[in-house]
């Protein structure tokens, strides 16, 4: 939200997991979409998850930008026909992903499911556990990890799950914040 406000971009937050009726949204009225994470699985039989995938496909047809983070990336993957599957062991905490250019990036993971490669997508990030990020068509990016977090958010997520996380220095997260800013600017400006 901070980046959008700095750019003069109006944002509207919908919480379909709490009953916000996204199935009633007109995709033609939406300039772009960011789909964030959550504790549910994209494989759960929930009406709002299905409606969100329809919205993602509709925005793609309109060439509108979509950024998916964690569950959001999995929603993009499933919306276009690839699989999301349970990992043998969840990825939780700070870890490293490797960009296709060979650069290493420290990121925060909090997921127990992984994505199959979406046919036609460009891999952006991977690690030894799974596909971690991709671009699809011109205006869609999915990231399995969280670049939007702060040290305080990481501590709160760990505490809420009764899985305390080691303290994280802001400097460790700064390169990820810069990558996120570049993605937002590419998609939404």
Which residue stretches match the model-derived regions?
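Conserved beta-strand segments of alpha/beta enzyme cores
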Residues: 10-12, 83, 106, 122
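Short loop/helix-cap segments at secondary-structure boundaries that form the rim of catalytic
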Residues: 1, 23-28, 76-78, 116-119, ...
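Short amphipathic alpha-helical segments
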Residues: 1, 45-48, 80-81, 120-121, ...
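Cysteine-nucleophile active-site neighborhood
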Residues: 35-100, 104
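N-terminal beta1-alpha1 cap of cysteine-dependent amidohydrolase-like domains
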Residues: 1-64, 159-189
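Amide-donor transfer/coupling interface in amidating biosynthetic enzymes
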Residues: 98-189
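Short loop/edge segments at beta-strand edges and connector loops
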Residues: 15-18, 86, 109, 125
